[in-house]
Amino acid sequence: MKKVIFSGIQPSGQLTLGNYIGALKQFGQFQDEYECFYCIVDEHAITVPQDRLKLREQTRSLAALYLAVGLDPEKATLFIQSEVAAHAQAAWILQCNVYIGELERMTQFKDKSDGKAGVSAGLLTYPPLMAADILLYQTDLVPVGEDQKQHIELTRDLAERFNKKHADIFTMPEVFIPKQGARVMSLQDPTKKMSKSDANLKNAIFLLDPPATIRKKIKSAVTDSSGIIEYNKEEKPGVSNLLTIYSVITGETISTIEEKYVGKGYGDFKTDLAELVVAELEPIQERYYAYLKSEELDTILDAGAEKAARVANKTLKKMENGVGLGRKRRR
């Protein structure tokens, strides 16, 4: 029996080359080896103000992009969080089993609420909803970044508490660190991670950037004055970042790439890298726009929501029985 992976992503901001290299590029491998549930977590998105039309547009866009990068709906389940009611229902049950002090200690809540007036209660209760997302599918593995590891720890605490107090229902999820965890950094500040929410658009290559924009961004990427193409994260973070991108896209080792560019300058290297990135992303963009215009996208999302609901509702019924909600029925 395959282990279960659950992965959720908010439909806010455009996905970057960093998202692709760090996670999306591995979809093909994951869906062959695991039972995968990929959820577009639009309910999480509304913990902060959203434009309703833009949110719906970004939700559909993200689904199309997931399919374009290689998610196979015959092998993995792709769905929208708000279209499976069990998520909100399970979140309420878990919310009644978590303590306010635990929620207030979450680093992400502190960061997002610090110095802000009118912070929504949803931002505070974000972790129980995330826990519901994960636990409903009897998830074994959760691929997350460093910023979410604390939430997974709380999810495990909630699962253990619920299992002991009510019924032994939940699988204990583990943080999943993919084998190939290439970390792509900002083009203008290679000491920080490339981010889809970065205000400076020059810092990131977005998956839907046109070729001319990609070439311009890579050409202007920060390097150094030595002109020598070699990997040294401490002394040459900019060049090292570009070498990482080159290596992941081509499959060549860093040392092979370094040898290839001995005696050549940054100009040649950046030009070649830009063409590699363009060639990698062009077919993804073609598939993306085809899905976006097609009714097939909605058919896939409908089927995904139905499958997800069947799995989630089984766990939800056990949760409701465990705490005594509703009438006890034989069926």
Swiss-Prot record:
<dbReference type="GO" id="GO:0006436">
    <property type="term" value="P:tryptophanyl-tRNA aminoacylation"/>
</dbReference>
<feature type="binding site">
    <location>
        <begin position="10"/>
        <end position="12"/>
    </location>
    <ligand>
        <name>ATP</name>
    </ligand>
</feature>
<protein>
    <recommendedName>
        <fullName>Tryptophan--tRNA ligase</fullName>
        <ecNumber>6.1.1.2</ecNumber>
    </recommendedName>
</protein>
<keyword id="KW-0547">Nucleotide-binding</keyword>
<dbReference type="InterPro" id="IPR002305">
    <property type="entry name" value="aa-tRNA-synth_Ic"/>
</dbReference>
<dbReference type="InterPro" id="IPR050203">
    <property type="entry name" value="Trp-tRNA_synthetase"/>
</dbReference>
<dbReference type="InterPro" id="IPR002306">
    <property type="entry name" value="Trp-tRNA-ligase"/>
</dbReference>
<dbReference type="GO" id="GO:0005829">
    <property type="term" value="C:cytosol"/>
</dbReference>
<comment type="subunit">
    <text>Homodimer.</text>
</comment>
<dbReference type="InterPro" id="IPR001412">
    <property type="entry name" value="aa-tRNA-synth_I_CS"/>
</dbReference>
<dbReference type="Pfam" id="PF00579">
    <property type="entry name" value="tRNA-synt_1b"/>
</dbReference>
<dbReference type="GO" id="GO:0005524">
    <property type="term" value="F:ATP binding"/>
</dbReference>
<keyword id="KW-0648">Protein biosynthesis</keyword>
<comment type="similarity">
    <text>Belongs to the class-I aminoacyl-tRNA synthetase family.</text>
</comment>
<feature type="binding site">
    <location>
        <begin position="193"/>
        <end position="197"/>
    </location>
    <ligand>
        <name>ATP</name>
    </ligand>
</feature>
<feature type="binding site">
    <location>
        <begin position="145"/>
        <end position="147"/>
    </location>
    <ligand>
        <name>ATP</name>
    </ligand>
</feature>
<keyword id="KW-0436">Ligase</keyword>
<keyword id="KW-0030">Aminoacyl-tRNA synthetase</keyword>
<feature type="short sequence motif" description="'KMSKS' region">
    <location>
        <begin position="193"/>
        <end position="197"/>
    </location>
</feature>
<dbReference type="InterPro" id="IPR024109">
    <property type="entry name" value="Trp-tRNA-ligase_bac-type"/>
</dbReference>
<feature type="binding site">
    <location>
        <position position="184"/>
    </location>
    <ligand>
        <name>ATP</name>
    </ligand>
</feature>
<feature type="binding site">
    <location>
        <begin position="18"/>
        <end position="19"/>
    </location>
    <ligand>
        <name>ATP</name>
    </ligand>
</feature>
<dbReference type="GO" id="GO:0004830">
    <property type="term" value="F:tryptophan-tRNA ligase activity"/>
</dbReference>
<keyword id="KW-0067">ATP-binding</keyword>
<feature type="short sequence motif" description="'HIGH' region">
    <location>
        <begin position="11"/>
        <end position="19"/>
    </location>
</feature>
<comment type="function">
    <text>Catalyzes the attachment of tryptophan to tRNA(Trp).</text>
</comment>
<keyword id="KW-0963">Cytoplasm</keyword>
<feature type="binding site">
    <location>
        <position position="133"/>
    </location>
    <ligand>
        <name>L-tryptophan</name>
    </ligand>
</feature>
<dbReference type="InterPro" id="IPR014729">
    <property type="entry name" value="Rossmann-like_a/b/a_fold"/>
</dbReference>
